[in-house]
Amino acid sequence: MKFSKQLSAQADLRYLNEYISYKDLKKAIKVITGSDVQVCTVQDVVSNFRQTNALTGSIFRPPESRFQELLNHELDKINSFSKREVEAILDQLAVALVIMWRLHAALTLLRLAPDSPGYAEAQALLKRLEQREQEIRNALVVYPQKRGRATEQDKAGSPSSNPRCRGVSDEPSSSSEERELGAEGDDFSSAGGKTSSRGEGDAKRRQGDEDGGEGEQDDAKRSVAEALILLEKDVLEVEGVLEAQSQEIVFLDSFVRLNFTGFRKITKKYDKHNQSSAASWYMSRVVRQDFMNLNFTLLLTRLARCYVALRSLRRRLGEQQQQSLSISPADDPSKAASVKEDRSTVGSFSQSLGPEGARLSTYKRTGGSDEGEQRREPRFSLAARSRGSRDCREDIKVTKYLIAPDELMKVKVLILKHLPLLAAGGIPMDDSVLCPFENSSQAVAAEDFSAALEAAASLLRTSGTASDKREARQSLGGSRVPTWEVYLDNEEFTYYTNTRTRRDSPDSCRGVAPSRRVVRVRWQGLPSLNSAGRQVALELSRPDSSIADPQEDITTPLASNAPDVASSAFTVILRQKQLLQLLHGLITPSKLLDQLMDEMEASAAGVATGEGANATAASHRTGARGAANRGEGSGGGGGNRGSDDRAVALTKQKRKADMLQVLQTVWDAVQQRGVSPSVRTWFYRTEFMSEDGVAWISVDEDIRFSREMNRTPPANQWIRSETEALSTDDVHPFPWGLLDVSFLVRDNGVALPQHAVQQAKDFHPLVGRDDLEDFVADLRGLSTLTEVPGFSLFAHGTAYFYTPRLQALQARMSGYEQAVHLIPLWLQYTTNAEFDDDASQVFDEATEGGKGKKADRTSVGQSRLGRNQGDSAERGQRAGSPGGLSRPRVCHRGSVIDVVHQGTSASLVHDLQASAQVSPPTSSGVDQLGNSHRPSVSESRHPSAPALSVLASAPSLPMPAPPLLEVSPFQSGARGLLTQPLLDDGDRMAGERQSASRGGAPTPSQSWLLTGARYWRRYCNCFSLSGSAGRRRRSMSCLFPWSQRSSARRIHPVGPRSMVAGGVTSGPSVRVEPKTFFANERTLLQWMNTAVLIATISITLMNFGNPVGRIAGLLMSPVAVFFIGYSFWVYLRRARALERKEPIAYNDKLGPSILVVTLMLSLSAVIALNLLYHEGEAQLPITPQNSSTSTAPSLPPSPHALPLLSQLNVSHSQAAYKAPSAPNATVNAGGYSVADVPAPDFSLSHPATAYAAATALAAAEAAAAAGPVSFAGAPERAVHAHVTEAMTHAASAETAAAEGARVTAGAK
């Protein structure tokens, strides 16, 4: 699909004029560059861009300047609309939050009795709150002009008829402005007016009920119920507004992506028409624009705050409804117990927010199972179990999905509606987001309703003023904090192999360092030049762990190793300087532990001595709450001081033992197994967790991988610097988002703690009504999600960068029963970096043909899922079969410097940069750096000791292709097609040479000694083959292996079981377009044109040239003959390969090289011959011919010569007649010379003699006259004619003299 159609299909019709004017820009480009002036006129373009100066004016301006002005016009339009939209969303969310605060105060007022002392004061306070709400709403109301220009369709049609118009009221109004205002402002005014009048009416009804006596209590309850119904309607209206703003945030993200793609497409089109390369410069300016740096983190934070308040308000409303509809215990004693139970159940939320600010401890993954604190913290967390079972996941279901980048915002907003937001973009949320009604709820729990209303009033006083304006100013340039992870492994990939070969077992969680754990270093923060003092976490982690694991929590600060702060027993917090000493063997684990314990003691005592202060006050408060929840702190009332001190001492000793064991394990791995940094990854994480700790969800975006093995970092660092510019060979941008869904299950036979089951039933509405499973099912049903079982960042990064080594290791392990597949199944579906719409268009043309072009795809999910699932499923079956490994792919466009973009739209920029990297590492035994990892014969027969140890303890783990991957978007999308290579093992030698040219280490095939020895062994083995059948064929394949590789290039359909472990798979057939055959013919004609031109020049030189020209023609004519034959051979070879769909090397490097070298040699030879001949110039005299051998014809007698004879008075006695000599008697022109012509004696006694003498005299005079003539500057042909004439006259003179002598002799 072309981008113009995609833009019109995906654009929001309300703001269609605010998008990039792609079609108008295409027309303007043709007018500016002059490529097609018939499309439109200058007046049309000017009118489209509203009188811009880009195309007008009498002063000459280059096309670049005019195009830049058009881009600036579009950028200004998009930037202004984006900022207005962000401010409008923030204003609407602020008004919604104010409304919910007022409704919360109104619910508090309903709990007061009319005869209570503070009822009148509370009622007056509520009126002031309503007035304050009205002032804030008037100040933050958003008019239609602020939200952008309305289209003609919006002005003419009804809002309800347009399904794409979001947030517009269905009530009819007189104008579009009133409709817009009703959608954005009147939704709140109705809530305010109803509540105000309802408050006064409720007070009057209550006062009437008090005067009327006890008989009218039913009417009072009925009035309270009616008031609650009206409040519920207000809550529904607020929920509708939040839903509309959620869709606005999703629309804004799509708006940014579409416009960025439009600018990228239009700049490329300008380069195409203008024959320039300015697209990169234009896009560098686009990246710095305001619309590319919108603070989506702030929008998500404000939206999450509103949804948390909405859920709290709903719980308070349900609590009040149950209290109003309940029967008094005095009237019906039988129901007193049930009423009491219901009140305790519905009041659990406010109780959980009450004492000692326990809100943060419930979100922290460190909690306790103390029975005395069950009522204070009804929410159950994963950390409530014991430490040994906390790190196991028998009762937690983990599912990981891959998300397309353009659907990340939609998924995050969907999750945010159901679960609280813990962290957005790596930034933890504060108390105002996680619990906006904390102070008010605490007062309600203490039955201090006046204090609750005063807390709500204080919140209103701080709203809509400086804080909101400050947040509005922060709508641009929102910062995010990346999470960095570095995994350590050795050259034998021991830890990676363990993770791929070992299964989960009940005993895997026993002990400090289970077999499946790997050494990992984790930290958070922006890249820094000086990071030696940064705090990092040295961990023994599971690579495939879920977000429920405490080690994956990014909200816990890496501040201290204190027991009340540490999130896991497998984590040690230390500085990077100390980590460098440990990895280099400069410090022992025991000594490092002593330093860490001293720092922990100093931090606990509040001694801030430079680097020794590792814990802040906030972390201590958080740790104190965690320790209180676990029962590790104070004894919970009644315990003596001595028992508390002993418990703290035991906890510290246990923590010290855990730290020592972790440090010792890392030390042994470094010293004995030689582990070093292998793979580094960084990403931006967004975390969600339910209030009771039943569900955890995380979304990782902008994931990038970096190679660290075989790299030499500086001496003062343990990895390469974070700010170092990395080439595309070392950085892999992962073009997908990662969704981790983890939640407790109840049907797997694992019994949860009793208090957790009771809290799940009493408190959490999702678990109680099975809505959590429904919500997860809705997530799974999204077309943009694809489940990938067993996915982990460590496995993907290692398999991507070190594919050849892993395949070589797998080949050595293939002979063992316990061998497994070391290459993950998802690798070939997720390693494509060409994430571009052009790729989708190519795939449409290649797979769907005519049907795909006619399909109407208005949805990104449909366009991604509806592409040729049959062929993709077949590819998935082939890839999912045992031993299905990727084929060699050594194709890179270059080593482009990669700059990490830190903006909010980093994924878009990274997708643009990802086009520099085409494919993952090869499987041909040569990695991207040219390092050979193909095992030798001895290695394949005798594996190393670590490999044997792995195989000895590795159970069999078959990995069939999962059904979900067979129909996943990665097989049916263009990215799966583009990852298929074009070359196979037949071009491995070329790949090795290409890899070596990038600076890699020399491979065995590059060493001529090893190459000669290998061919000699093959030659000797050829004659030792047993059997008579096929002996000749086997001998030829041994002696000439390239013939076998050439025949192996042909691809035939293979079944899913046709591949063996460790072998090389045959790729899919390449579909050839008809235009490819025409291109092959055009190439032949171009070669023939050049060859015919060379042949014409050489033939001309040989026929009409001088001796030097003839030599040059002889040199160039074989060149022309060779290229005529060579071009025809190349044409036949390519045509045959295209017909058979053979993936041969279509890039011809031999022919052009020979052509250039031959032409250079020919021209050099011609120039050399001319220079050498003129320097050694010599005269070539022409000797006179004898009379007997002369071939010149005799001159017949002529009567005109008789008068001349009378003038000659020459006696017969004269010796001879010679032509007059002169200095220029010798004529030299074109290599010819004429000498003096001797004249024999003759007499005049006979007429014939006289005629011969006259003829000889005329010839001699002609030769003498031609002698002194200068031929300098004359054409060569004219010079040649003159010389020929002179020689003819000389020959005639000689003939005449001989004839005269003969006549004289006859006369005598």
Curated annotation (Swiss-Prot):
Residues 859-871, 915-938 have a biased composition (Polar residues). Residues 144-220, 321-384, 611-645, 846-890, 915-946, 981-1004 are annotated as: Disordered. It is found in: Vacuole membrane. Its main location: membrane. The record marks Y22, K26 as: Important for inositol polyphosphate binding. Disruption phenotype: The VTC2 locus is refractory to knockout, and may be essential. Partial disruption of the gene results in reduced polyP accumulation. The VTC core complex is an integral membrane heterooligomer composed of at least the catalytic subunit vtc4 and the accessory subunits vtc1 and vtc2. vtc1 is a small membrane protein without hydrophilic domain. Vtc2 and vtc4 are related and have 2 hydrophilic domains that face the cytosol, an N-terminal SPX domain and the central core domain. The central core in vtc4 is the catalytic domain. Belongs to the VTC2/3 family. Accessory subunit of the vacuolar transporter chaperone (VTC) complex. The VTC complex acts as a vacuolar polyphosphate polymerase that catalyzes the synthesis of inorganic polyphosphate (polyP) via transfer of phosphate from ATP to a growing polyP chain, releasing ADP. VTC exposes its catalytic domain vtc4 to the cytosol, where the growing polyP chain winds through a tunnel-shaped pocket, integrating cytoplasmic polymer synthesis with polyP membrane translocation. This is Vacuolar transporter chaperone complex subunit 2. It comes from Toxoplasma gondii (strain ATCC 50611 / Me49).
